[in-house]
Amino acid sequence: MFRQWSVQSGPAPRRPESQAASEELWEQEVERLCASRTPVRMLPYAMADKRFIRELREPEGVKTTFWQRWHRPRRVARQHLREAEQRLARGFGLWEGALYEIGGLFGTGIQSYFTFLRFLLLLNLLTMLLTACFVLLPLVWLRPPELGPALKLRLQCSSSPLPQSDIPRFHNPLWNILTGRAFNNTYLFYGAYRAGPESSSEYSIRLAYLLSPMVCLLLCFCGILQRMAEGLPQQTLLGQRYRTPLSAKVFSSWDFCIRVWEAATIKKHEISNELKMELEEGRRVELAQQQTRAQKACRLLTYLRTNILIVLLVVGAISAIFWATKYSQDNKEESLFLVLQYLPPGVISLVNFLGPQLFTVLIQLENYPPGTEVNLTLIWCVVLKLASLGMFSFSLGQTVLCIGRNKTSCESYGYNACDYQCWENSVGEELYKLIIFNFLLTVAFAFLVSLPRRLLVERFSGWFWTWLDREEFLVPKNVLDIVAAQTVTWMGLFYCPLLPLLNSVFLFLTFYIKKYTLLRNSRASPRRFRASSSTFFFHLVLLLGLLLAAVPLAYVISSTHSSWDCGLFTNYSAPWQVVPELVALQLPLPSQRALRYLSSHAFSFPLLILLSIVLTVCISQSRANARAIQGLRKQLVWQVQEKWHLVDDLSRLLPELSPEPGSPHSRASRPRSFCPGFPCPGSPGPRTPRLAPSNRLSSSSLGAPSASVPASRFHFPSRTEL
């Protein structure tokens, strides 16, 4: 390894065998550095050592080839250009500075919520871009025919319910905007899309409208899986019992490039949060190991009691949503119409507001670690939210599509044509009201609850106001809100193609509202958790919401009769029927035969066998990789033990090789570091070997400390130093 030799006095006497062993180690290290293709700038050495390594790789007097001289400046230019692109991308990244500030002040756990919100915004923008490119722009370019008169259907309906056209309308513009009736004849809803008959030469708007939601859901599915897979390799390699040493955090956490006081303050908070999380995790592990059998039995009973109570709360909430939706759709009297319009969204929002609060209190009784507590709260909140949305969809299906009910209008037209002549618009309006109501609640709680609470706590003093304090920023509740809004957006892709645009605007505003609430109106949670322990669950919850949205959409596209009065699929028994028609019109006969074969049982059975084989191979490879990872862990432990043995041998060897106390090579003049060639904490830097007279570097250029100068210690820079 690199050794520092004095150029002012000769070396101390050494034993021949030890000198030969050290020279052999030195020659091996030099050969390794010369043969390595690692760039010099990436090596963990001081600048003087890097210059020496460059001289070893490119000695003077040796001529390089023309290709090397031509390729080197271009390689350096490409590297500089790549770094400039990365800096530019970080500079123009969405909310990079805000995310850095939030992560430093409140920890990576709360920062993960805002990062997740940004990911949802990008998903919505991608969905909107695909819809605009494949549906809206071709529709405007092709100029579909004008809307003709509505079909006059003679419906056999009872006299009690009012048809949709006779439902009282309120001409207040604000109310029409909130309910979505102001946009019934716009491209926001399904009913405004029209197209002529299909032909073999024109672009099919119907096929694009049908496939764009499916493609968007598929792309969102791939993006969520990619984000979920990013954290898996680290968890697999490190394992669940891995803990970063506190010494590594203490000596390597500070960024010495910081020259601004605000950035230094944020960095101090970030390091403090990391150390607090490490100490709290260690304390919880010690307490869990010291529990007796009686304490474990009491804890198990607490788990059972809490989970039974949570299940009862979920069942009651689902029942309330079902009956609220059913009552709202079955009663459309003029006196109650204004209230019943927002009865289902109101009940769902009330459940989603009270549910996380109760779940947080109940799960805290179980005394879980902060990361596990957040994940369990999130799981129960998601079960509540997805079950609520599922029950809401089922109730709408019962009312609109007569699922599980027998009605005369449903037998004739496939849906409840008496009450809903354009049922796609009605479903779209319900989903639109859910999105609007969710955002209005976010604004109301931020400025009508959190802000007055903070002002009252700061204005008055007393035990009550001390107990009340500022609002705690609950990550599970906030994640639940944006996941619910995103699930509703995915459910409405077929009924409201422009709903992702509306949700993108709401997510953009939600980021700044939540940031203001966090920085001004909220207090930091005393139970800190890591982002890596919850980010995976955030995306898992989002994936469950995607599956919940995909199941009703697949049923509607494949098996539900379209409205006779509006939309693109008025003449089709189901929207999917346009696909066989276009296949027969636009594809040649061999392609049609190939598609028939791909959709037949003769192809499905071999495909199933092939997928089974591939799945078996993947599982076998995964198990082999797990065994290899275990072997690498053991090998790493063995290497660490071997290093410690070498350190012990070196500590026994140093007294034998130490010169006289007055010599400049005495042990007192050297720093006590067992990291030769590597920048250890507290050491002045790597040590460089003695060079030939032509390539010799002075000891002053290596930055070798004198005996009177103590080794530098780690400290935070003061404000005057910055």
Swiss-Prot record:
KO phenotype (gene knockout): Knockout mice breed and grow normally. No major defect in T cell subset numbers or function. Decrease in CIB1 protein level in thymocytes and lymph node cells.
Superkingdom of origin organism: Eukaryota
Pro residues: bias regions: 678-687
Biased composition (Low complexity): 689-712
Residue ranges of the TM segments: 119-139, 205-225, 308-328, 376-396, 431-451, 493-513, 537-557, 599-619
InterPro entries linked: TMC, TMC_dom
Keywords: Endoplasmic reticulum, Glycoprotein, Golgi apparatus, Membrane, Nucleus, Phosphoprotein, Transmembrane, Transmembrane helix
Statement: the UniProt record of this protein carries the keyword Translocase: no
Tissue: Expressed in thymus, lung, prostate, placenta, testis and spleen. Expressed in lymphocytes and peripheral lymphocytes.
Subcellular localization, as worded in the UniProt entry: Endoplasmic reticulum membrane; Golgi apparatus membrane; Nucleus membrane
Keyword Zinc included in the entry's annotation: no
Residues modified by glycosylation: N184, N375, N571
Membrane topology value: Multi-pass membrane protein
Renumbered residue ranges of the record's region TMC domain: 366-534
Cytoplasmic face of the membrane: 1-118, 226-307, 397-430, 514-536, 620-722
Domain remarks: The TMC domain mediates the interaction with SLC30A1/ZNT1.
Subunit-level organization: Interacts with TMC6. Interacts and forms a complex with TMC6 and CIB1; the interaction stabilizes each component of the complex. Interacts and forms a complex with TMC6 and SLC30A1/ZNT1; the interaction regulates zinc transport into the ER. Interacts with TRADD; the interaction competes with TRADD/RIPK1/TRAF2/cIAPs complex I formation and facilites complex II formation.
Family of the protein in this entry: Belongs to the TMC family.
UniProt protein name: Transmembrane channel-like protein 8
Organism: Mus musculus (Mouse)
